[in-house]
Swiss-Prot record:
Family assignment from sequence similarity: Belongs to the universal ribosomal protein uS11 family.
GO cellular component, as recorded: ribonucleoprotein complex; ribosome
Protein name: Small ribosomal subunit protein uS11
Native organism taxonomy: Bacteria, Pseudomonadati, Pseudomonadota, Alphaproteobacteria, Rickettsiales
Organism: Anaplasma marginale (strain St. Maries)
Entries under InterPro entries matching the protein: Ribosomal_uS11, Ribosomal_uS11_bac-type, Ribosomal_uS11_sf
Keywords, in A-Z order: Ribonucleoprotein, Ribosomal protein, RNA-binding, rRNA-binding
């Protein structure tokens, strides 16, 4: 888990959760966008296909939130989630159970409006 060394008292922040099919990446920043903590399921000792599970997302978010609450005293967050992964709902629930006041939940998953042509299907 990457933690910024400078200790500041940050009461309000943002939790960015990127849930892919293979991993979950969590970044916690203050309102100006300065990163306080970033971690992933792989950094929390989940390897292989276990990184894509909802439990891995829950544990990853819980570790990141615990670190930022202890170091910076964060109390209020807004959650921004993106990606199609399996751990989306579990990650949001983990933020809500960590004694943080959640002001908003935004979904910023990018969806194509019939954009680029997909690669041709593999024949075995």
């Amino acid at each position: 888990m990457a933690v910024v060394k400078k200790r500041r008292n940050v009461v309000v922040g943002e939790v960015h959760i990127y849930a892919t099919y293979n991993n979950v990446i969590v970044t916690i920043a203050d309102q100006q966008g300065h990163v306080l903590v970033t971690t992933s399921a792989g950094a929390c000792n989940f390897k292989g296909s276990k990184k894509a599970t909802p439990y891995a997302a829950q544990e990853t978010v819980a570790r990141a939130v615990k670190a930022v609450v202890e170091r910076n005293g964060m109390r209020t967050v807004s959650v921004c989630i993106s990606g199609p992964g399996a751990g989306r709902e579990a990650a949001i629930r983990a933020v809500q159970t960590c004694n943080l006041n959640v002001t908003s939940i935004r979904d910023t998953t990018k969806l194509p409006h019939n954009g680029c042509k997909l690669p041709k299907r593999r024949r075995v």
